[in-house]
Amino acid sequence: MASSTRIAQRYASALMDQALADGTLEQINSDFQYIMSLVRESDEMVAVLNSPVIRYNAKVGILKEVFGSHVSTLMMNFLIMLAEKRRESILPDIAASFTEMYNEEKKFIPVGFTSAVELDETMRATLIDTIAKRTGKTVLPTFSVDDALKGGITI
């Protein structure tokens, strides 16, 4: 396990603990989804997060301007703390670790289904129900079609 992954897990765990204590778990999860959607869409945001040249005060100003009115106080304080500790470049890893912890806490299991043809609603429901019964978790499904498959389904 890479060092940055362990560090990201520690930050995610601390944020998870605080969100559970504050009763803001759903809001923090929503905040991460919003933040990561912007990061995925913006090369400029990735450059800001990864830049060692941008000073702390400037970075905090950018984070407040971009996210301030869209995320909770806890998340904004967390982002500022990451900038202060110069850990903002691992934000995507922290978000991924947090999402794993969130899914575990909520008993969600993400499952990807790939089939040779589009599955009808009955087949989709049967697959989801079968996996939910076997795992005891709520399935978060994604479905895709791969013409290269000769038949069947990969999970």
Label the predicted regions:
Residues 1-154:
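Elongated, mostly alpha-helical coiled-coil "stalk/stator" tethers of large membrane protein machines
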